[in-house]
Amino acid sequence: MHTLIERLEKVTNSKELEEVRLNALGKKGVFADKFNQLKNLNGEEKNAFAKEIHHYKQAFEKAFEWKKKAILELELEERLKKEKIDVSLFNAIKTSSSHPLNYTKNKIIEFFTPLGYKLEIGSLVEDDFHNFSALNLPPYHPARDMQDTFYFKDHKLLRTHTSPVQIHTMQEQTPPIKMICLGETFRRDYDLTHTPMFHQIEGLVVDQKGNIRFTHLKGVIEDFLHYFFGGVKLRWRSSFFPFTEPSAEVDISCVFCKQEGCRVCSHTGWLEVLGCGMVNNAVFEAIGYENVSGFAFGMGIERLAMLTCQINDLRSFFETDLRVLESF
């Protein structure tokens, strides 16, 4: 039993300490074996041997606790030395990249601001006039339905597009006007390609009548799309929007299949990216403008980001899935 304490004194780490403990105090350890030997003894010899075992067991346990404390302090000191941080040294901290939506917004702003477009910011809460009536959306238009629009009790609503900013800008300023607006919009929809909150960018140019033509609009849009997507093909289609006349939609050649046909472009080879047109005179009349002309355009920022990042589910932009966010 003397050898147990001698062995304990030579221990240098927790693993060795546990091995010595089990060898001494375990079910099959030295002291358990000694206690089993008592059954073979009688009388005073048994009592004397039992006292001797208890004496050495208590001595071992006391030495063990002292050694355990010393080992733990030593290991803590070594661990602290290893984990010591020298704040004067450079540490290669992992930095995150820009979120796809922020990257897309910044890229849009970088194109339009050098051309003289002023960035306007509008309210997220609007009234019926600025969100619908001034934009030539009649009372029976389906966009006014409560199934599509978030209404408040005081007849206010969450804007369904960024177009109200155009109305506010024209009310507060006089031509010539060149502006863009980027921001959140809200509609009651949620699926692979729609979310209750999404982002739009709209542009407006207004000047004296005759100074702004459709060819100006066409030039701006084509320059922007080639800047944003590179060497894609463009297709213009006539369309209808209450606030523009004439109106058009613009498609780009599919960035996924290069017009060979795929599920994303419904095997047509084309992807719709934006709507535009010359501002309807009814909009100017609602504002009180006379003898002016202008063009407007609008597009979904998520739509642009989905195409550039090749993301199929719009909801991925707003969910906190690090596997998705770290892939950008």
Curated annotation (Swiss-Prot):
<comment type="similarity">
    <text>Belongs to the class-II aminoacyl-tRNA synthetase family. Phe-tRNA synthetase alpha subunit type 1 subfamily.</text>
</comment>
<dbReference type="GO" id="GO:0005737">
    <property type="term" value="C:cytoplasm"/>
</dbReference>
<dbReference type="GO" id="GO:0004826">
    <property type="term" value="F:phenylalanine-tRNA ligase activity"/>
</dbReference>
<keyword id="KW-0648">Protein biosynthesis</keyword>
<dbReference type="InterPro" id="IPR045864">
    <property type="entry name" value="aa-tRNA-synth_II/BPL/LPL"/>
</dbReference>
<keyword id="KW-0547">Nucleotide-binding</keyword>
<dbReference type="InterPro" id="IPR022911">
    <property type="entry name" value="Phe_tRNA_ligase_alpha1_bac"/>
</dbReference>
<keyword id="KW-0963">Cytoplasm</keyword>
<dbReference type="GO" id="GO:0000287">
    <property type="term" value="F:magnesium ion binding"/>
</dbReference>
<dbReference type="GO" id="GO:0006432">
    <property type="term" value="P:phenylalanyl-tRNA aminoacylation"/>
</dbReference>
<dbReference type="InterPro" id="IPR004188">
    <property type="entry name" value="Phe-tRNA_ligase_II_N"/>
</dbReference>
<dbReference type="GO" id="GO:0000049">
    <property type="term" value="F:tRNA binding"/>
</dbReference>
<dbReference type="InterPro" id="IPR002319">
    <property type="entry name" value="Phenylalanyl-tRNA_Synthase"/>
</dbReference>
<comment type="subunit">
    <text>Tetramer of two alpha and two beta subunits.</text>
</comment>
<dbReference type="InterPro" id="IPR006195">
    <property type="entry name" value="aa-tRNA-synth_II"/>
</dbReference>
<keyword id="KW-0460">Magnesium</keyword>
<keyword id="KW-0436">Ligase</keyword>
<keyword id="KW-0067">ATP-binding</keyword>
<dbReference type="GO" id="GO:0005524">
    <property type="term" value="F:ATP binding"/>
</dbReference>
<dbReference type="Pfam" id="PF01409">
    <property type="entry name" value="tRNA-synt_2d"/>
</dbReference>
<feature type="binding site">
    <location>
        <position position="245"/>
    </location>
    <ligand>
        <name>Mg(2+)</name>
    </ligand>
</feature>
<dbReference type="Pfam" id="PF02912">
    <property type="entry name" value="Phe_tRNA-synt_N"/>
</dbReference>
<dbReference type="InterPro" id="IPR010978">
    <property type="entry name" value="tRNA-bd_arm"/>
</dbReference>
<keyword id="KW-0030">Aminoacyl-tRNA synthetase</keyword>
<protein>
    <recommendedName>
        <fullName>Phenylalanine--tRNA ligase alpha subunit</fullName>
        <ecNumber>6.1.1.20</ecNumber>
    </recommendedName>
</protein>
<keyword id="KW-0479">Metal-binding</keyword>
<dbReference type="InterPro" id="IPR004529">
    <property type="entry name" value="Phe-tRNA-synth_IIc_asu"/>
</dbReference>
